[in-house]
């Protein structure tokens, strides 16, 4: 069976690693990463497969993450976004089915390219392929971006009511740990997205200025959910757990958005699951 072809950053970071899991679970096909950003040895391995893709006229799927700027004329775009307001497409993709949010769409439209008004990070659909129920044993789960992990661990690692979750500790492990928390606060976008997927209350945290993009990807995602003007809760050395818990406000998950994103998935088949 011919595999599917996609591009993503090869890393342990949840949003990057989720590409393979999501695409293979939804398509029941193997997926090959043909990103030009792979290291030399991985590029050499993927090169013959990419040549086969070109010969057969197969598209390259661009799915989860702030990798929309990587898309080219062979790309089918389903759900990624830009990492900052300064990024642009290099050329018009073969097809754009959905993007992460309205801010990414506005950039595409400003370039004179077509982009449907269909939004959502595909990780919102993770609960479809890995259905699990929450079992809260911690008052709060903190999911820092990997650049903030050591700092967050130092601040809150000793708190018995708090679980500090390593976003690079494995796709399913992160989800399982998150489901053990009553609420989730995260400086990592996909910590917030997977919380929404499983309907766990969430809060955007900011530990530092190390997360690149000046908050663009967070605002892009939140605007797709109809949540405008959301700002992060700033964590300092003096921020207590009760301060974070007190910053949560109720919000609804846009299930219509998830349904529309699912409807336009270009590689889905019947029978989900991993």
Language-model segments: what does each one mean?
Residues 1-274:
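Active-site anion-handling motifs in enzyme catalytic cores
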């Amino acid at each position: 069976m011919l595999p599917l072809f996609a591009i993503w950053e090869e890393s342990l970071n949840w949003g990057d690693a989720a590409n393979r899991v999501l695409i293979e679970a939804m398509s029941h096909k193997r997926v090959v990463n043909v990103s030009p950003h792979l290291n030399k040895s991985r590029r050499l391995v993927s090169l013959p497969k990419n040549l086969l893709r070109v010969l057969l006229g197969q598209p390259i799927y661009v799915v989860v993450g702030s990798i929309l700027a990587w898309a080219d004329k062979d790309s089918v775009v389903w759900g990624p976004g830009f990492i900052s307001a300064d990024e642009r497409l290099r050329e018009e993709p073969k097809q754009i089915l959905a993007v992460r949010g309205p801010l990414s769409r506005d950039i595409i439209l400003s370039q004179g390219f077509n982009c449907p008004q269909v939004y959502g990070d595909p990780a919102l659909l993770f609960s479809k392929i890995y259905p699990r129920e929450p079992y809260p044993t911690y008052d709060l789960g903190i999911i820092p971006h990997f650049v903030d992990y050591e700092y967050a661990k130092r601040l809150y690692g000793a708190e018995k009511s708090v679980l500090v979750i390593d976003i690079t500790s494995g796709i399913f492990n992160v989800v399982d740990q998150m489901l053990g928390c009553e609420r989730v606060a995260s400086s990592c976008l996909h910590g917030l997205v997977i919380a929404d997927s499983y309907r766990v209350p969430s809060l955007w945290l900011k530990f530092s200025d190390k997360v690149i993009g000046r908050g663009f990807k967070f605002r892009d995602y939140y605007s797709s959910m109809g949540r405008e003007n959301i700002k992060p809760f700033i964590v300092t050395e003096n921020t207590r757990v009760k301060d974070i818990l007190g910053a949560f406000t109720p919000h609804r998950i846009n299930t219509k958005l998830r349904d529309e994103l699912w409807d336009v998935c270009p590689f889905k088949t019947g029978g989900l699951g991993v």
